[in-house]
Swiss-Prot record:
Name of protein: IMP cyclohydrolase
Gene Ontology MF term list: IMP cyclohydrolase activity
Family according to the record: Belongs to the archaeal IMP cyclohydrolase family.
Keywords: Hydrolase, Purine biosynthesis
Catalytic activity: IMP + H2O = 5-formamido-1-(5-phospho-D-ribosyl)imidazole-4-carboxamide
Species in which this protein is naturally found: Natronomonas pharaonis (strain ATCC 35678 / DSM 2160 / CIP 103997 / JCM 8858 / NBRC 14720 / NCIMB 2260 / Gabara)
The gene coding this protein: purO
EC id: 3.5.4.10
Pathway this chain belongs to: Purine metabolism; IMP biosynthesis via de novo pathway; IMP from 5-formamido-1-(5-phospho-D-ribosyl)imidazole-4-carboxamide: step 1/1
Pfam family, one: IMP_cyclohyd
GO biological process assignments: 'de novo' IMP biosynthetic process
Role according to the record: Catalyzes the cyclization of 5-formylamidoimidazole-4-carboxamide ribonucleotide to IMP.
Length: 191
């Protein structure tokens, strides 16, 4: 099944996977603790605004944010200004809305912290829910948050776990795990 990009958020960890039929030549790089999706060196040039973005950011030792696009940055910024996680997620998703591409691709994002949330904004809905167990939401087919499993405790292993899920067209994945008073991040580019 092709579900597109997806996230899994749990109370103490989260992960994000890029799945793509159209733009498979992407990878994740670590830029001082911020994980960024971008094209590989052999990727064809494109003016598509949805190809490169920060997919995982931490906000001090308090929060981690994951998502499938540029909404990660304003969510992190609002959290750093003291917004509650639910409000930072809802306001940023609502402000940016779904992606204005040929598919009206939903934006998905999650926050891990003292309170953890998952959210999506689609053409027909804005959904933000508290997370008590591992919860998945995807851009296609699984566009409503639903319970799932999440086993790994190491961020890179968590990313590999999502990459290896039996869902079509994996490209790369990112993971974050709460480690006491801070967060550890990792990624997997299928190598």
């Amino acid at each position: 099944m092709y579900v597109g990009r997806f996230i899994v958020v749990a109370p103490d960890r989260a992960a994000y996977r890029v799945s793509s039929r159209s733009f498979p030549n992407r990878r994740i790089v670590d830029r001082d603790g911020t994980l960024t999706v971008g094209p590989t060196e052999d990727a064809p040039e494109t003016d598509n605004p949805y190809i490169s973005y920060n997919c995982l950011r931490t906000v001090g030792d308090d929060y981690a944010v994951v998502g499938n696009g540029t909404q990660v940055d304003p969510i992190a910024e609002k959290l750093s200004l003291g917004y509650p996680p639910r409000d930072a997620l809802a306001e940023s998703l609502l402000a940016l809305d779904y992606e204005k591409d040929d598919y009206d691709t939903p934006r998905i994002a999650g926050v891990v912290g003292d309170e953890s949330y998952i959210g999506t904004v689609r053409r027909d809905a804005l959904i933000v829910e508290a997370v008590e167990e591992p919860t998945l939401v995807a851009t296609y087919e699984k566009s409503e948050p639903e319970p799932t499993s999440l086993g790994a405790d190491d961020p890179s292993e968590l990313a590999a776990e999502l990459y290896d899920r039996d869902l079509e067209h994996p490209v790369c994945a990112a993971g974050v795990v709460a480690d006491g008073d801070s967060f550890e991040v990792g990624y997997y580019n299928g190598e």
